[in-house]
């Protein structure tokens, strides 16, 4: 997870790879019926259907590089050698064509990952607030998705069928020790995680919902950023004509004039205690909390 202290910090930037789809790259198995024409990973990987589809890749570039992103947006292109040139050639050529076009228009910079890392480390001492969003939907389902992340937490605000809800909230704490720090992993697969507050991907079941949902029907959302302050503000337009806002920052998120928020945690991630100041959790023996500073 991102470091909060010098003691646990490493000097090497670590980047999200693959160029993930802000809508379908999370919970992809639960959303698969919404995009029957494409299969595989919902990323920019040129081997898979999305990565070689011109309409989808043009959408990726627009959503990644035209929407507010605070510290900046990045995506990687290319594929592991084991996939072979025959499998990636069409998608890779398409993505290079689009990258060349956007670069010639002054909308992005194309560089090696090493160059990106050196530039990032020079610009930032700590992991900065960043945003990634999709304000249109290439599948035509009308879904909207806003991701915010910083060194303390991440969250995903999701709009589908008029319902606005959080589908993901995680706390970052560099005091949380990963499982294999002192004990080797002997299983076929390994688990690396952070501290879940809301984990829809893992905890939703046919019987239990997993979402923090706002009441009422929402027509649309729009974004505004304050790069200097590191804040992202979501303006929500409701079907009844009301307008309200959510603001994301390193300290958390705040709502102004928002309707009631219903909390559903799904299966296996309930808070261990609820008190007047918020919610207390325990994951793998590590206690953590989400505090409410105003409201009830």
Where are these regions (language model features)?
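Acidic, contiguous internal or C-terminal segments within carbohydrate-active enzymes
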Residues: 232-275
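Substrate-binding cleft of secreted/luminal carbohydrate-active enzymes
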Residues: 54-120
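Aromatic- and carboxylate-enriched substrate-binding clefts and catalytic-loop regions
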Residues: 1-16, 77-82, 105-131
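Acidic-aromatic substrate-binding/catalytic surfaces of carbohydrate-active enzymes
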Residues: 157-231, 238-240
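Active-site-adjacent pocket scaffolds in enzyme catalytic domains
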Residues: 1-63
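Broad, structure-driven detector of short, well-ordered beta-strand segments within folded domains
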Residues: 152-159, 242-250, 290
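Beta-strand-rich recognition/accessory modules
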Residues: 45-62, 73-80, 266-296
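Surface beta-strand/loop "capping" patches
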Residues: 120-159
């Amino acid at each position: 997870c991102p470091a909060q202290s010098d003691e646990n910090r490493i000097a090497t930037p670590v980047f999200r790879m693959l160029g993930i789809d802000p809508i379908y790259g999370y919970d992809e198995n639960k959303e698969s019926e919404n995009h029957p024409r494409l299969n595989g990973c919902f990323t920019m990987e040129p081997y898979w259907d999305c990565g070689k589809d011109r309409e989808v890749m043009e959408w990726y570039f627009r959503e990644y590089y035209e929407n507010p992103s605070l510290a900046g947006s990045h995506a990687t292109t290319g594929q592991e050698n084991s996939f072979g040139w025959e499998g990636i050639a069409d998608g890779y050529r398409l993505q290079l064509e689009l990258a060349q076009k956007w670069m010639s228009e002054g909308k992005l910079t194309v560089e090696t990952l090493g160059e990106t890392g050196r530039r990032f480390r020079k610009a930032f001492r700590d992991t900065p607030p960043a945003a990634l969003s999709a304000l249109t939907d290439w599948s035509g389902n009308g879904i909207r998705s806003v991701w915010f992340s910083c060194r303390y937490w991440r969250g995903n605000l999701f709009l589908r069928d008029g319902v606005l809800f959080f589908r993901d909230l995680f706390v970052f704490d560099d005091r949380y020790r990963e499982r294999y720090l002192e004990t080797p992993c002997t299983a076929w697969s390994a688990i690396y995680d952070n501290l879940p507050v809301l984990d829809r991907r893992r905890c939703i079941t046919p019987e239990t919902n997993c979402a923090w949902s706002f009441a009422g029907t929402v027509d649309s959302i729009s974004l505004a950023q304050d790069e200097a302050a590191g804040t992202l503000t979501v303006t929500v337009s409701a079907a009844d004509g009301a307008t309200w806002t959510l603001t994301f920052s390193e300290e958390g998120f705040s709502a102004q004039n928002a309707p009631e928020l219903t909390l559903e945690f799904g299966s296996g991630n309930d808070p261990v205690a609820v008190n007047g100041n918020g919610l207390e959790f325990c994951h793998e023996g590590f206690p953590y909390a989400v505090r409410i500073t105003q409201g009830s």
